[in-house]
């Protein structure tokens, strides 16, 4: 029986899985830590050898332009037609990673979404955002139309959010993901203390006597709430805002939800406050969002190959 190979290349790992039959689940899910992915063809050869794979859906962290993606955080480029021709796939689809996450919504049960704030749906717009190695985001309109963004590399909000960390010097922090990502947590902690720790270690120190860890995480939480508040109004996300990624799943366990909602509302004027009050905010608790999104995308396009 032929299979589809699903691959997600993020800033740190390559994750993969297979699916076949009615394409309802992921099989043999695994990951490869990446220090360099210049040998991607070799990796792909190993993943398809004697596996009866005839189709590939691959999501990559970077903007898709004319069928190609060049990663923003790595020296790596990929073209879907080149891959299809080289490996003789029946079909090959290349997605931006957040395009893939937008397609993942249909895979979730209600138990897969932890609710920070309930809401009332008033249109078909869903907004996804996730601070990880960088900061990704996408808009889902209805169930099929996903518009990935490069919000993490914009600069308009950075200076305002630096105030949440009591940083006046913006020279080291220019883009939104410089102040709102896992890397940002590490960079800001190091900027404040001179000590380099992983974002995971800093999150684990939250609530301890490490005052700077507490301060940085509090600043991060406020920055996230203020950012999604602006995104909610920018995209009128009447179907909800969904925050994804392992980092936010960890922070969700320790953060003050009521304070987060207070930051989300901010000092918006009445009519805009009323919009925010209707918007649901959820945390995607299901792992492998991109792989699920890749599979859902494939199922939608299986008869179009």
Residue ranges of predicted features:
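Glycine-rich beta-strand-to-loop/alpha-helix junction loops that act as flexible
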Residues: 58-63, 130-133, 238-248
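ATP-binding/phosphotransfer module of carbohydrate and carboxylate kinases, centering on a glycine-rich
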Residues: 1-49, 164-305
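Short beta-strand-loop/turn "lid" adjacent to the catalytic site in phosphate-handling enzymes
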Residues: 49-94, 103-110, 252-253
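Short glycine-aspartate micro-motif
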Residues: 4-8, 55-57, 93, 126-130, ...
């Amino acid at each position: 029986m032929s299979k589809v190979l699903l691959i997600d290349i993020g800033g740190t790992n390559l994750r993969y899985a297979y699916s076949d039959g009615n394409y309802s689940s992921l099989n043999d899910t695994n990951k490869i830590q990446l220090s360099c992915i210049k040998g991607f063809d070799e990796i792909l050869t190993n993943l398809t050898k004697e596996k009866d794979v005839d189709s590939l859906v691959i999501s990559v962290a970077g903007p898709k332009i004319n069928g190609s993606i060049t990663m923003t955080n790595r020296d790596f480029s990929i073209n879907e037609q080149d891959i299809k021709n080289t490996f003789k796939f029946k079909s090959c689809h290349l997605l931006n990673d957040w395009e893939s996450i937008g397609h993942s919504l249909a895979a979730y049960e209600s138990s897969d979404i932890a609710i920070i704030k309930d809401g009332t749906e008033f249109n078909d717009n869903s907004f996804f955002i996730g601070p990880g190695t960088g900061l990704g985001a996408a808009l889902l309109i209805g169930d099929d139309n996903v518009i990935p963004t490069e919000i993490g590399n914009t600069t308009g909000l950075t200076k305002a959010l630096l105030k949440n960390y009591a940083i006046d010097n913006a020279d080291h922090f220019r883009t939104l993901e410089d102040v709102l990502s896992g890397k940002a947590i590490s960079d800001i902690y190091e900027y404040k203390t001179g000590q380099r720790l992983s974002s995971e270690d800093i999150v684990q120190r939250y609530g301890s006597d490490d005052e700077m860890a507490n301060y940085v995480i509090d600043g991060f939480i406020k920055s996230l709430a203020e950012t999604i508040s602006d995104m909610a109004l920018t995209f009128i996300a009447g179907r909800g805002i969904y925050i994804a990624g392992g980092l936010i799943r960890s922070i969700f366990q320790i953060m003050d939800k009521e304070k987060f909602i207070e930051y989300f509302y901010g000092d918006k004027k009445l009519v805009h406050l009323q919009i925010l009050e209707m918007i649901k905010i959820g945390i995607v608790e299901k792992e492998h969002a991109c792989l699920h999104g890749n599979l859902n995308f494939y199922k939608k396009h299986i008869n179009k190959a």
